[in-house]
């Protein structure tokens, strides 16, 4: 049985780890390289490193921070932010990323996903989906894709888009609920489940973890293969070990360190 992965997320702005609420109100959470070392030592299964202003400010990811983070950390590292070309993917992989997250560029050109997957293998291409619920209370649930760090609406249906990019070669989908991001009120389980049911690739649940039960729900109710969290780890509410123990006690298959 495949083990559920716990993935701390480092959102980086101007070389510092930050944590926001619904993509805004960013507060400082430390040095990315030191954070990476701490999570590596704590037994995190993977680390997600997102340069959250790269697409918005139209510049590349901070490669020196990426390479120093990769150097300090032995768990798989997913890096995203400002990835626009096959050359960008290659540069990040050479800098030490194991997987590369594509967001805005995948929306603008889904064929880019196919091109990158063909060149480097679908196992290292992660499409990051930032979605917001746009349906009313009495309508069938519907979510819209946003790009540029959640700033730009696209009119695209999130579930349809997920299906399309997974067919084009995305090896994994990182699904973030913008409504839930930073609120600590739990994942948008309906969104996670709708996408997990629509695709054949692993889905990472993201946005809204407030406690350890939320991680369990992401897998059990949301159908996620991995759970991503930031606030509960960055600010010392829980450790990765506590999260793993809690999820294992709930009957989920986890990689437990000796």
From Swiss-Prot:
Catalytic-site annotation from UniProt: 11, 130
Protein name listed in UniProt: Imidazole glycerol phosphate synthase subunit HisF
Enzyme class (EC, first level): lyase
Encoding gene per record: hisF
Function: IGPS catalyzes the conversion of PRFAR and glutamine to IGP, AICAR and glutamate. The HisF subunit catalyzes the cyclization activity that produces IGP and AICAR from PRFAR using the ammonia provided by the HisH subunit.
GO terms classed as biological process: L-histidine biosynthetic process
Pfam assignment, any one: His_biosynth
Keyword tags: Amino-acid biosynthesis, Cytoplasm, Histidine biosynthesis, Lyase
